[in-house]
């Protein structure tokens, strides 16, 4: 039946179906290039040059597989990950999962919101508090698009993702990294000291985002008129394109920081504002301005995605709904508190990414269990190879977290 349908579908129509179903992965991918990534990648590149590029490469491959599994769960079952946990786990475990998922979502939003505020401060010369107010207004305006349906939001967020990617192509041209050394950094694993382990955990936490694991399964769970086969075929292409773009941006961030800072004697740069001000004399005003614009674009789009993920988490785990503007208002409060207390914003960004890395396994374990369940997934159940790869990812994440805890004690 499926084969005959594929044969009978005209190629142009099939392409239109694939294109019309693409978009959810671009929303998820924004979570992989948020300001937390800027902070960790800049610090990693400035401190260790190209040494930690391999972490970005492997984390991005892991992220591709994870997001594909999340999307597949929504397509195959019509339910998202949080709903499946609610239906199958004991009530105390469900509440515990909900609490940790909300904490992860708030830590994520803290990084994204403050990052956008820093971007406005650098570009417009306003205070960080004024930048936060501008960020709040802008995110409310973007969230209003949701009233028009999911597709307009996908287009806007996808456009912002492409803008950030284009910005970093320009930054790479300005910084002129050494290609051979860059290639070695991407291919040869190395963790020279405890600081490198800390930053590697931060890069992992910034690259694999627990909140978008929950969100992606929600974005694909609505059936529509297309078959599961069509939707899954489109999703594979969607994930491949979106996550490749996100992976390139992360590599470009770290490579630019390495070329511009580490190899010019600025290895101690650890703050986004410091990076912006140092870029001006090193690479020119244009490079610094593009950096600031990309930070604002990444911050605004990712904080919107974080708000959507928070809604999915709350509704999925505890069936409780609050208006999205209420959630947006509440989740802005920690960012304003951090700013008003005068805390180190970039340090908060990096610490939030390390915290995120501890939430990855908690989302991955049930995701693997559900997508490996033949009764639940039917023909879309994971193959043995996918299950093995998924378990290896869980072990890597848990191992890195354990090593990090021991290193910090």
Curated annotation (Swiss-Prot):
The chain crosses the membrane at residues 19-39, 46-66, 98-118, 122-142, 155-175, 196-216, 241-261, 290-310, 320-340, 348-368, 388-408. InterPro entries: NRAMP_fam. It comes from the Bacteria. It is a multi-pass membrane protein. GO terms for biological process: iron ion transmembrane transport. Keywords: Cell inner membrane, Cell membrane, Ion transport, Membrane, Symport, Transmembrane, Transmembrane helix, Transport. GO terms for molecular function: cadmium ion transmembrane transporter activity; manganese ion transmembrane transporter activity; metal ion binding; symporter activity. One of its GO terms (cellular component) is plasma membrane. It holds the Pfam family Nramp. It is found in: Cell inner membrane. Belongs to the NRAMP family. H(+)-stimulated, divalent metal cation uptake system. This is Divalent metal cation transporter MntH. It comes from Yersinia enterocolitica serotype O:8 / biotype 1B (strain NCTC 13174 / 8081).
């Amino acid at each position: 039946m499926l084969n005959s349908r594929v044969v009978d579908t005209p190629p142009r129509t099939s392409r239109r179906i694939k294109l019309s179903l693409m978009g959810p992965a671009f929303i998820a991918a924004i979570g992989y290039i948020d300001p937390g990534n800027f902070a960790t990648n800049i610090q990693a590149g400035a401190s260790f040059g190209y040494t930690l590029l391999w972490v970005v490469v492997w984390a991005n491959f892991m992220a591709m597989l994870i997001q594909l599994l999340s999307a597949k769960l929504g397509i195959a079952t019509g339910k998202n990950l949080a709903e499946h946990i609610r239906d199958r786990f004991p009530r105390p475990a469900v509440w515990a999962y909900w609490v940790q998922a909300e904490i992860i979502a708030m830590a994520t939003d803290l990084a994204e919101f403050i990052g956008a505020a820093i971007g406005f401060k650098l570009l417009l010369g306003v205070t960080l508090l004024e930048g936060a107010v501008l960020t709040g207004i802008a995110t409310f305006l973007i969230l209003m698009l949701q009233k028009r349906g999911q597709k307009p939001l996908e287009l806007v967020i996808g456009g912002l993702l492409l803008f950030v990617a284009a910005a970093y192509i320009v930054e790479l041209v300005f910084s002129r990294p050494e290609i051979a050394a860059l290639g070695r950094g991407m291919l040869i694993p190395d963790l020279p000291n405890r600081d490198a382990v800390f930053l590697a955990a931060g890069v992992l936490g910034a690259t694999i985002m627990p909140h978008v694991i929950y969100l992606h399964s929600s974005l694909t769970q609505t059936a529509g008129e297309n078959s599961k086969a069509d939707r899954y075929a489109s999703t594979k292409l969607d994930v491949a394109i979106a996550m490749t773009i996100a992976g390139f941006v992360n590599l470009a961030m770290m490579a630019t920081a390495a070329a511009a800072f580490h190899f010019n004697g600025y290895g101690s740069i650890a703050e986004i504002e410091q990076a912006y001000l140092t870029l001006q004399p090193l690479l020119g005003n244009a490079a610094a301005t593009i950096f600031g614009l990309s930070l604002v674009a990444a911050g605004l789009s990712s904080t919107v995605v974080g708000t959507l993920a928070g809604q999915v988490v709350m509704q999925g785990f505890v069936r409780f709904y609050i208006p999205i503007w209420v959630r947006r208002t509440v989740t802005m409060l920690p960012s304003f508190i951090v700013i008003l207390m005068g805390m180190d914003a970039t340090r908060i960004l990096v610490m939030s990414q390390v915290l995120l890395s501890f939430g990855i396994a908690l989302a991955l374990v049930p995701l693997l269990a559900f997508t490996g369940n033949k009764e639940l997934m039917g023909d879309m159940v994971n193959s043995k190879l996918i299950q093995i790869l998924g378990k290896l990812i869980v072990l890597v994440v848990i191992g890195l977290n354990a090593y990090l805890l021991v290193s910090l004690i």
